[in-house]
C-alpha cells in the first residue's frame, strides 16, 4: 500500500480480517470499527463513507449471524454441570434485567468498576486460572510497546481517539454482559467467568491512544499498527 493511503482492494483485505474477529469471539466485534480510521484519501468522501460503513455493516451481520448459529450448539457435560450447580439460566437472567433495569444497571456498572483491577491481574493466566500462560502477558506488552512507543509519529484526531476509547469500553462492557447472561447466577451482584485474556484486544486498542506526532508523515506505520491490533 501507499504511504499516504490504501486502495479499495487493500481495504477489502483488511475487512476480511475484521470479519474473522467476531467469528473468534463476538464481543470483540468492536475492533472492526478500526476500519473507519483507515486513510482512503484517493476515494471520494461520499463513496469512502459508504464503503466504510457498508463494510462495518457486513461484519456486524456476519458476526451476529454466526453467533446466533452457535447458540444452537449443545453445551458439553462439564459446562452443563457448572451451569446447573450455579443456577445459571440466561432466559431468567434476561427477564430479571428487563424487569429491574434501573436496579440492575447501577449494580452492573459498580461491578464493572470493582472487578476491572482483578481482571487485569488475570492477563498472564489461561482458562480458570488453573494454568499459567505467561505468553499472554508478553503478547500484550509487545503490542502495547509497538503501538505506543515505537511509532512516535502517529497522531490521532480527537474524534478518532474518542472512537477508539468507545471500542475499548464496548469490548469490556459487552464481555461482562455476555458472561453475566451465560455464566452468572440469576440476580447475582457479581460477574462470573471473567478472564484477563478477554481484555487483550481492549488493551491493544487503548494503547493506540498513546501515539503522538504528525500522522501525515507516517501513515504507513499507522496502518500497520491498526492491522496488528486486529490480528492480535
Stretch-by-stretch model annotation:
Residues 1, 190-210:
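Hydrophobic/aromatic-rich transmembrane helices and adjacent perimembrane loops
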Residues 40-43, 71, 176-183, 211, ...:
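Transmembrane helix-loop junctions and nearby membrane-interface residues
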Residues 14, 18-35, 133-145, 198-205, ...:
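Conserved beta-strand->loop/alpha-helix structural units within folded catalytic cores of enzymes
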Residues 218-230:
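Interfacial loop-to-transmembrane junctions
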Residues 26-150:
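Membrane-lumen/periplasm interface segments of specific transmembrane helices
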